[in-house]
Amino acid sequence: MPLHTGDIRKITIQHLIEMKSYCEKISMITAYDYSMASIIDKTGMDIVLVGDSASNVMAGNTTTLPITLDQMIWYAQSVRKAVQRALLCVDMPFGSYQGNSKKAVHSAIRIIKETGADAIKIEGGKEICESVKRILSAGIPTMGHLGLTPQSINKLGGYSIQAKKKDEAQRLMEDACLLEELGCFSIVLEKIPAKLGKQVSEKLSIPLIGIGAGPYVDGQVLVLQDMLGINKSFAPRFLRCYADLYNVIKKSVEHYVQDVKNANFPNEQESY
C-alpha cells in the first residue's frame, strides 16, 4: 500500500523514510513567497524548499552566492505561514557554514528558531562534515546536497554535469555514505549521470532527491519558476515545463495596459 495519501496531515521525516521503503517517489519544489506557497501546499507536495535559488529567480543574480542568511530567513518566514502539510526545508546560504562549524550551527539554529522550518539543507561532503555534525548534534534535521553544488560554482568552473569520471563518482558515493552515517535524513543529487544516481539510491537507506540525476532516485525537485515556464532563457536538459506562464503573464498584463489606456477599465460594474 502506498504511504502517501490525503489522510496525512503533516509530512514528517519518518514519512519520507517510509516512502523510500515503499518505493513511493517523493515530490519536492521550491517556494519563496506566501502566495505561491499557499497554492503548493494544497497540491500534495511532500517537501517545500526555500532555496538559495531565490538569489537567481527572485533577486536577479547570476549565482546563488550573494543571498544572505537574513534574506533566506525573511523568505522562509513568508513561506512558513503558508506551508502546513509539506515538510519545510531551508537552504543554508553561502558564507553561513563554510569553514566554521560553530558559525554553521549558529546559522542553522537561527533558521529553525526564526522561521519555524522543519529542516535545513547544506551543500558539500567530507569538507563540511564537522559543520554537519554540529548541526545534527543540535537536533536540527539536515538534508545534504552533492553533485553540482551551486555555491561552489567558482571552484567547479560552471554548471556542467558532475561525477562523470570513475574517481569523481567514487568520491560522490563516499560523500553520500558519510552524510548518511552522520545522520542526514536525505540528500539532493544535482546534475550527475542517471546510472550513478541509481547506484547511490540503491546503496543508501535514506531518500535521494534528484535534479538532473535521472529517474532512478527516490524523488525529484525543481525550481518552481522554472517548471512553470516563467524564465524563457533557462532550458537545461533536466527541466520539464508544466506551463508557459511567461506568455500567460505577459499577455494578461498587456491586456490590462490596453484596457487602462483605452479607458475600458474599470467599467460601471467595477466602480462604487
From Swiss-Prot:
Residues involved in 3-methyl-2-oxobutanoate binding: D52, S53, D91, K121
Keyword match Transmembrane helix: no
Localization per Swiss-Prot or TrEMBL: Cytoplasm
Positions with a binding annotation for Mg(2+): D52, D91, E123
Gene Ontology cellular component terms for the protein in this record: cytoplasm
PANTHER family: 3-METHYL-2-OXOBUTANOATE HYDROXYMETHYLTRANSFERASE (PTHR20881:SF0)
Protein name listed in UniProt: 3-methyl-2-oxobutanoate hydroxymethyltransferase
Organism, scientific name: Azobacteroides pseudotrichonymphae genomovar. CFP2
Lineage summary: Bacteria, Pseudomonadati, Bacteroidota, Bacteroidia, Bacteroidales
